[in-house]
């Protein structure tokens, strides 16, 4: 484990998190709180961004690993972890593991929402 990688994640994560917060606030003010438009926008644009980075790293950009970590794990991860979920799903599909990709996508959504509900219920009981 290199400290430069940890610092790259921390720096990128802080920028991505601030961007997520500002976008969420902006959409909330613009469209109101009835539907999570900001979150939807963040998840879609974060997935697009990580796809662009992954594609550029694979075919065009020869950047140091710390810069790649800063952009993908840091900025994209801070902006939305949904982008990482999307990239992992794509990699499974690209490797021909379509059933595993489907199971991963369904399990991720269902189990994550289930875990959230469980967490809320635990707090309510306490």
UniProtKB/Swiss-Prot annotation:
A Gene Ontology biological process term: cellular detoxification of fluoride
GO molecular function terms noted in the UniProt entry: fluoride channel activity; metal ion binding
Main location: membrane
Residues noted as binding Na(+) in the record, renumbered to the chain: 77, 80
Subcellular location: Cell inner membrane
Pfam families cross-referenced by the UniProt entry: CRCB (PF02537)
Transmembrane helix is among the record's keywords: yes
Keywords for this protein: Cell inner membrane, Cell membrane, Ion channel, Ion transport, Membrane, Metal-binding, Sodium, Transmembrane, Transmembrane helix, Transport
Source domain of life: Bacteria
Membrane-spanning segments: 5-25, 39-59, 69-89, 100-120
Listed GO CC annotations: plasma membrane
UniProt membrane topology term: Multi-pass membrane protein
Signal peptide start-end: none
Regulation: Na(+) is not transported, but it plays an essential structural role and its presence is essential for fluoride channel function.
Record flagged with keyword Disulfide bond: no
Reactions accelerated catalytically: fluoride(in) = fluoride(out)
Family under the similarity heading: Belongs to the fluoride channel Fluc/FEX (TC 1.A.43) family.
Role noted for this protein: Fluoride-specific ion channel. Important for reducing fluoride concentration in the cell, thus reducing its toxicity.
Name this protein carries in UniProt: Fluoride-specific ion channel FluC 1
Gene responsible for this protein: fluC1
